[in-house]
A protein has these predicted regions:
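Short Gly/Pro-enriched turn/cap motifs at secondary-structure boundaries
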Residues: 6, 172, 258-260
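Short linear loop/turn motifs
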Residues: 32-33, 40, 169-171, 234-244, ...
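N-terminal hydrophobic or amphipathic helices and topogenic motifs
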Residues: 1-28, 262-290
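Pocket-lining segment of extracytoplasmic ligand-binding domains
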Residues: 59-60, 90, 132-229
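Short, glycine-/small- and polar/acidic-enriched structural segments
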Residues: 1-130, 134-148, 175
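Secondary-structure end/capping motifs
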Residues: 190-276
Length: 290
């Protein structure tokens, strides 16, 4: 059982493709893609054993490992940060202009790099939690919001709002890769062959999606409709384009689908320096090497 960390969308296109095209079946795997609910998130499902593989962001995974939940990364899709700060007001032109302002942040986490940035810049920001959409931002109830370039920012643009100044965390020295596939260390130790096959078939799914984006989008929309997710094809197409772009490193190199030791060290040092973890998590730890 595989659980992506959110509701069906193009963020997970490669896995839907691998399922629909029979890539998992070809390597002898019978995969069920089971999305989590708000009351039972992906990590809970992994810990209780109802899911065997989940997607997580690198920062989340490092925090969980530090908390005593041994996780192993078996595939890394994201190679750069999608995080951005999007101002609602025209008078926010620099980071310092965020001082004393209300800024939206996901209730479920994901915003740690932005919070670390704010602390380092000594910005007094009032973080306002939101669940999943940009309603608070659109209504003007907050002065700015955290967003991903592949989802919330696209929603904002689709509403006809064109922010003049946006802050990409990658441009500010916080380019931390995000989504990867994770399993518990125990499951990794006892199912290495199957997990290697799952990772390879998933990689094939993503490579096929990059080569056939229109057909991949059709597969995504079938998944969306089956789960009655409120979205549309235009938004999902833009999301897919953006997700595929984020699978390349900033230097433009082709997707490697693996974590780099440098990225793990950078993320771990960032969290350690901010006091969000107690111990430095190493590349060997997170990739299941002895």
């Amino acid at each position: 059982v595989f659980s992506p960390q959110w509701t069906p969308q193009s963020q997970f296109a490669g896995y839907y493709v691998a399922q629909a095209k029979g890539f998992y079946k070809e390597v002898g795997l019978d995969i069920v893609i089971d999305h989590p609910s708000a009351s039972n998130p992906a990590l809970n499902r992994l810990r209780e054993g109802s899911s065997h593989v989940i997607t997580l962001q690198l920062v989340q995974a490092i925090k969980y490992i530090d908390q005593g939940i041994p996780l192993v990364n078996i595939l890394q899709t994201s190679q750069q940060s999608s995080l951005m700060i999007v101002p609602r007001r025209k008078d926010i032109r620099t980071l310092q202009d965020l001082n004393g302002k209300k800024v939206g942040i996901w209730k479920a986490g994901f915003g740690e790099p932005a919070q670390i940035l704010a602390n380092r810049q000594k910005l007094d920001i009032r973080w306002i939690p939101f669940v999943s959409n940009v309603n608070l931002f659109i209504s003007g109830a907050i002065d700015a919001t955290l967003a991903t370039s592949y989802n919330e920012y696209l929603q904002i643009l689709a509403c006809g709002i064109q922010p003049e100044h946006v802050f990409y965390l990658a441009d500010l020295g916080y380019d931390i890769p995000e989504d990867g596939l994770y399993v518990t260390a125990d499951y990794y130790d006892t199912h290495r062959c199957e997990l290697q096959a799952f990772a390879e078939a998933s990689r094939r799914g993503w490579e096929w999606a990059a080569a056939h984006p229109e057909e991949a989008l059709t597969i995504v929309m079938e998944e969306v409709r089956r789960h009655h997710v409120g979205t549309n094809k235009v938004h999902q197409k833009r999301m897919l384009d953006n997700i595929l772009h984020l699978q390349h490193r900033r230097n433009g190199s082709s997707p490697a689908f693996e974590l780099s030791p440098e990225d793990v060290e950078k993320a771990s040092d960032l969290l350690l320096d901010a006091g969000l973890i107690r111990n430095k998590i190493t590349y060997r730890q997170i990739t299941g090497q002895p």
